[in-house]
């Protein structure tokens, strides 16, 4: 595990422990009953691909540890609407506060504004967080293989599947891909950014997709900037992408989304 990931997970563990003191899992579970059914995150990605289109998970992201503040005029509702109108298949919303200036309220607001499925982008270390994710309306959660032991991944995935949610399993290496494929989920993401030094390379993604069974929905994450990047990856049978910073830095987010997808 990288130093930054170790630090983030340690901070997350403290925050989750503190949250548990204030609300029980039973109370959280009762809140999940007030939510509409999960919208089908992976299904939405697969549908776009079946239509011969690129599948975009568009990320609502205010800041990051490596880049600092990304979007000063941060408006989750407006960004969600722009992404949907721009042609995104799904949304991803950062809810981590200390490192990404995210918040659960951003996900709630974004999901209420659109009909797209929404991923809770956070560092999941405890099944309790999955219940919390469903309680705020998330349709999918992220599992970062580098951050967890196998038994932790299995418990978190099981909690997500029990709620009818999808789990996006993020890997960075051959070894992590092998571990990911022991899980039930077949929604696999490869982070093009090396968390050790934040460098970006698509080569890792091109190699790892060779390990993925054909039934997997394979998502390329991070460092994607142009429509040409999508075209290049499509030549390697990669048609699903998670993009945040590139779009969040643009004045016209809707138009930037359309440009990225080649819809103009």
Curated annotation (Swiss-Prot):
EC top class, as a word: lyase
Pathway entry: Amino-acid biosynthesis; L-tryptophan biosynthesis; L-tryptophan from chorismate: step 4/5
Gene3D superfamilies reported for this sequence: Aldolase class I (3.20.20.70)
Acetylation recorded as keyword: no
Superkingdom classification of source: Bacteria
BP term (GO), one: L-tryptophan biosynthetic process
Coiled-coil intervals: none
Keywords: Amino-acid biosynthesis, Aromatic amino acid biosynthesis, Decarboxylase, Lyase, Tryptophan biosynthesis
Keyword flag DNA repair: no
Single GO MF annotation: indole-3-glycerol-phosphate synthase activity
Reactions this protein catalyses: 1-(2-carboxyphenylamino)-1-deoxy-D-ribulose 5-phosphate + H(+) = (1S,2R)-1-C-(indol-3-yl)glycerol 3-phosphate + CO2 + H2O
One Pfam family, short name: IGPS
EC code(s) of this entry: 4.1.1.48
Family that this chain belongs to: Belongs to the TrpC family.
Matching PANTHER family: INDOLE-3-GLYCEROL-PHOSPHATE SYNTHASE (PTHR22854:SF2), TRYPTOPHAN BIOSYNTHESIS PROTEIN (PTHR22854)
Official protein name in the record: Indole-3-glycerol phosphate synthase
């Amino acid at each position: 595990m990288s130093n930054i990931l170790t630090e983030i997970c340690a901070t997350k563990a403290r925050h989750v422990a503190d949250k548990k003191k204030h609300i029980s899992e039973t109370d959280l579970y009762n809140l999940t009953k007030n939510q509409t059914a999960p919208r089908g995150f992976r299904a939405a990605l697969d549908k776009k691909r079946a239509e011969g289109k690129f599948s975009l998970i568009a990320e609502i992201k205010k800041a990051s540890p490596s880049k600092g503040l990304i979007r000063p005029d941060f408006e989750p509702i407006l960004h969600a609407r722009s992404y949907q109108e721009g042609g995104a298949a799904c949304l991803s919303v950062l809810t981590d506060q200390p490192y990404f200036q995210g918040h659960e309220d951003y996900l709630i607001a974004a999901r209420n504004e659109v009909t797209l499925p929404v991923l809770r982008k956070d560092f999941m270390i405890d099944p309790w967080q999955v219940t919390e994710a469903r309680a705020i309306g998330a349709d999918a959660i992220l599992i970062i293989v580098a951050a967890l032991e196998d038994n932790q991944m299995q418990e978190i995935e099981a909690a997500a599947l029990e709620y009818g949610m999808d789990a996006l399993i993020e890997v960075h290496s051959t070894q992590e891909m092998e571990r990911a494929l022991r899980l039930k989920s077949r929604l696999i993401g490869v982070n093009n950014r090396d968390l050790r030094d934040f460098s970006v390379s698509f080569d890792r993604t091109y190699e790892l997709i060779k390990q993925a069974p054909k039934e997997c929905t394979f998502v390329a994450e991070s460092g994607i900037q142009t429509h040409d990047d999508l075209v290049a990856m499509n030549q390697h049978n990669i048609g699903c992408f998670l993009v945040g910073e590139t779009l969040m830095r643009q004045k016209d987010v809707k138009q930037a989304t359309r440009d990225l997808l080649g819809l103009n």
